[in-house]
């Protein structure tokens, strides 16, 4: 993705206001940082499509993901983005391997899951159940499907 990323979010809630107007490169690494409660997670939820009750526009090159004026909102599953929640939610009744495959059912990938498993060093965890994983292991398992979707 070499296109420019345009993000304009204007969100007003009773105890929270977020206004952000950014133009970011479509390649490389961008870091979003700030104090607790400043809106980092909310902004990422807007980009991912998990929050849609805001005024503004999100576009990746010519692809418009959200435009409140035009009433155009792309569904979450149509956005090529990897999103990993702060709390790694895994299905406790499934093995790690089953959790990984479940997370990819709706998103055909160009990159095989095996590459993510190797990259994150979780191959030895595949037969284990989530309740036996440490917090860091759970997080790496949650990251693997996001990487495999080629975000």
Description of each model-found segment:
Residues 33-35:
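The feature captures the beta-strand-to-loop junction immediately N-terminal to the Walker
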Residues 65-82, 106:
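ABC ATPase NBD coupling module
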Residues 93-103:
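Short coil-to-helix segment of the ABC ATPase nucleotide-binding domain corresponding to the Q-loop/switch region
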Residues 129-133, 137:
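Conserved ABC ATPase signature
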Residues 143:
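Hydrophobic anchor residue at the start of the ABC signature
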């Amino acid at each position: 993705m070499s296109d420019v990323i345009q993000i304009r979010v204007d969100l007003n809630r009773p105890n929270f206001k977020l206004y952000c107007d950014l133009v970011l490169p479509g390649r490389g690494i961008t870091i979003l940082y700030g104090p607790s409660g400043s809106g980092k997670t909310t902004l990422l939820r807007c980009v991912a499509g998990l929050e849609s009750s805001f005024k503004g526009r999100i576009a990746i090159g010519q692809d418009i993901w959200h435009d409140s004026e035009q009433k155009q909102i792309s569904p979450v599953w149509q956005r090529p983005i990897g999103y990993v929640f702060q709390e790694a939610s895994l299905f406790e009744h499934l093995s790690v391997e089953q959790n990984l495959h479940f997370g990819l059912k709706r998103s055909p990938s160009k990159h095989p899951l095996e590459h993510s498993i190797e990259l994150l060093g979780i191959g030895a965890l595949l037969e284990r159940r989530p309740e036996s994983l440490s917090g860091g292991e759970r997080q790496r398992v949650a990251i693997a499907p996001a990487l495999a979707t080629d975000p």
